[in-house]
Amino acid sequence: MTGFFVLAIYIGVFVVSFFLVTKVVHRATVRDFTSLKTVTFGDESAVRPNRWAGVISILTIFLIWGMFTGSALLPKFLHAPAPFVGTAEFTYTAEANGQRDDATVTVLVHPREQDVEAPEVAPGDGFAKNDSATIAQWRTGLIRVDSNDEITKADGAEVVAINGQPIARGETVKIDSGSVTLSDKGTPNFAPSRGWQMEPLYLPPPEEVWTRTVQVVKEGFRGFTLWEHLGYSLFRVVVGFFFGALVGIPLGYAMGLSNWFRGWFDPIVEFMRPVPPLALIPLVIIWFGIGESGKIILLFLAALWIMAIAARSGVSGVNISKVHAAYSLGASKSQIMRYVIVPNSLPEIFTGARVAMGVCWGTVVAAELVAAEQGAGMMIMVASRFQNTDIVILGIILIGIIGFGIDMLMRYAERILVPWKGKA
């Protein structure tokens, strides 16, 4: 249910911001001859990212993150319903030897980081006595209501109603602050209302992630600084991608220009392309060991097939009329390669390079499973074992930021080196 509301909020913000920003920008646009210029639908070269959309998109993600984690950075009226914290009460009816008696259970639901004592309650009259217990928020607890009763379950007593509603074993009764389920052995199990907010074990609020980030920057993680972890990951990714491109691009050119190369390597490339790098980890360990070479080879294989296919596709997409025109002007094969095939295939190669770099960043976590002592992927895997979700999120964010930065650099290089992309 929480996931549905998150998706609904995200879609709602997208739609509302689209119409509002479009309307405001349209009104603020100066009416001149330039404003009359139209862009043909399908002209990809004329499409530019809307900066307002990018800013609103990032703010929306942080807003939703804060809403559903109860972040102190947001005003409370923006928070999603929180889990119940406070004192909850319900009555139970015990039946024994044909007699019934009611008693009250008082449960103190406390924040997860606090250690509190159960409230004191008067025992009351009758064979069923009042009880008290403590339960942390987001948790459930069995309440042995017969532990202080005059007639216990061993004597034949049984809970038959909660707040006056009949209940049998395995059934649940809703109360204002949660629900009570009667276990298979007849013991009430109280579950406080969980609300819509995520438990910090699964998704900590932004300020907790920031606090842990500052701590890791100052103290490091498992004997290495944060920058050393990121540096090792970046080194592995760059080296693996470099060798993948170094082998893959010439292989792709050969497959695009030679029938023999296409027939020889096409089955291999198309067979290996859908194989996930994770599936290769056991073989990489067996063949290359658990050292640094195994991790780099795994990243090399992740990039190799993508770059080969991108180069082959780039060659296949060269307009044959350009080749004929070059031949008619007396160009040699080497000149055709240098001045026609390579320039016209570069857009596809850059696209493949961006995809391959993204795959390498996704694979670095798996590569650093191979007995790594440093790296962002190693940080994530070690933190996940100890349920340090804040470090896991920190590692994911850093990998995403670095990957995004590399992609921006590659886009910039593409604009400089391939200015003719998208032009006839």
Sequence positions of predicted segments:
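Periplasmic/extracellular loop-to-transmembrane helix junction in inner-membrane transport proteins
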Residues: 1-5, 35-48, 68-98, 104-144, ...
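C-terminal transmembrane helix and the adjacent membrane-cytosol boundary/short C-terminal tail
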Residues: 14-31, 316, 393-424
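Transmembrane-helix boundary motif in ABC transporter permease subunits
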Residues: 239-269
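Generic hydrophobic transmembrane alpha-helix motif, especially the helices
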Residues: 256, 265-306, 313-314
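Short cytoplasmic-facing helical segments at TM-TM junctions of multi-pass membrane proteins
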Residues: 267, 306, 310-353, 376, ...
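Glycine-rich helix-loop "coupling/hinge" segments at transmembrane-helix boundaries
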Residues: 286, 315, 362-402, 418-424
